[in-house]
Amino acid sequence: MKQSDVNLLCREAAACLQRMNWALPPEPQWAATDFGLGDYSSAGLVEVLLANEPEYCEKIMYARPDMVTPTHTHGKKKEDIVCRSGAVRMTLWNENPLTHPASGPVRVQINGQERTIASGEAFVLTPGERITLVPGIWHEFAPSAPDTLIGEVSTWCDEATDNFFADPRVDIFHAIEPDEAPEFGGFATDAQP
């Protein structure tokens, strides 16, 4: 991924945040990724880290419609994914869908209510709706409408050791080709709680 692509996606995210009247704190930490897959138009995400404390984490995220965050799970992190604007298409599995066929129900909380979702079946969160994901629930998401902002409120986020992707090619710490200067401040990758 080129730095010019990172800058472009972050500029798009900043414009969307402004249109949606989402104010950021001074000097926020930005990250844009194609997950190391080389095609950010199909798999990509912009994250703005708002807080990452030992007890909690908050992010606001942006992606273009149908720009997927690939199937993954966490070993420790519990998180709420919140549709802040637009629409978020979610798909859930109890196990890695690349190694185990999608079968059986997935038990989750949506808007604080216990729900059963069919494994591998997509559903949509609309503005204000949230889903609570506990460690071990495999999930994939993508905006299904323009101007979608996705919130995340979670326990501490350990990007380096607590993201497990179904596709072994995914690399969230992939190299950025420096074809122009960075326009947005990035995440600190060595932060510890």
Label the predicted regions:
Residues 65, 76-98, 104, 111:
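Glycine- and acidic-residue-biased ligand/ion/polar-headgroup-sensing regions
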Residues 1-56, 105-115, 180-193:
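A short, N-terminal "cap"/entry segment at the start of jelly-roll beta-barrel domains
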Residues 96-116, 140-193:
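Double-stranded beta-helix
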Residues 64, 120-145:
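Conserved metal-binding segment of the jelly-roll/cupin
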Residues 70-72, 90-91, 132-133, 139-144, ...:
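Short beta-strand His + acidic residue motifs that chelate non-heme Fe in jelly-roll/DSBH
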Residues 57, 77, 111, 119-120, ...:
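Short, solvent-exposed loop/turn positions at domain surfaces
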Residues 48-57, 67-79, 98-100:
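A short beta-loop-beta micro-motif enriched in histidine and acidic residues
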Residues 60-61, 72, 78-83, 122-123, ...:
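His/acidic/aromatic-lined binding-pocket segments of jelly-roll/cupin-type domains
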